[in-house]
Amino acid sequence: GLGRLAACYLESMTTLEIPATGYSICYELGIFKQKIVDGQQVELPDDWLNLGDAWLMPKPQEAEEIHFGGRVRTRWDNGHLMVVHEDYTRVLAIPCDMLVAGYNTDHVNTLRLWDAKSPKPIDMQLFSQGQYLKANEERAMADSISTILYPEDNHYEGKSLRLKQQYFFVSATLQSITRQHIQTYGTLKTVSYTHLRAHETSLHL
């Protein structure tokens, strides 16, 4: 499918020794198993990370912070419009890097997969009050973003989750690209086709 096509792009660029980084979400159950039951295809979750993956290198020190929900407040300060985002839910995008080798070359590129985690594992105040499920809401919301590829979207919850996945992926990736560019060039004024090109492989998140 399109995911395989994106992998071919990255592998080909590596073979041609073109510096590139691929981005996606590190789905816990990204590839489903298929079985035939009573003549019908049945999809089952495939816990592909259960046995570990020696090729994935987590880099929590390079995590990006994504904000969901909340409200926006504006104010003027010395003639400048200030926009303040408040009361949002924080989700961390933890990068897990995989090196991609090409053919007949020593050049290596990187595939960066984002794993969604809550910076606050549990709300101890709610947990102490006996509200155990509510105490885990933020963690459950964050975990759901990178749990499974292609969640059903024939209901509101599914549409909401897909939108969160898309926003999470785009925000984390653009933050990462921006941060790396500033670290290299010291400014965003040099962002141009000379230094940066982006290609999107349209996946049905």
What role is predicted for each listed range?
Residues 4-8, 108, 161-176:
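Generic recognition of stable, solvent-exposed alpha-helical segments in well-folded globular domains
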Residues 8-12, 16, 116, 170-184:
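Generic, well-ordered alpha-helical scaffold segments in large soluble proteins
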Residues 10-11, 15-33:
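Glycine-rich phosphate/pyrophosphate-binding loops
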Residues 21-23, 31-32, 102-103, 121-125:
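Short helix/loop capping segments that flank catalytic or ligand/cofactor-binding pockets
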Residues 37-105:
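Extended, Lys/Arg-enriched charged tracts that mediate electrostatic binding to polyanionic substrates
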Residues 106-108, 115-135, 173-181:
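Carboxylate/His-rich catalytic cores and anion/metal-binding grooves
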Residues 137-154, 182-188, 197:
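Active-site-adjacent bridging/hinge elements
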Residues 194-201:
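Conserved small/polar residues in nucleotide/adenosyl-binding loops
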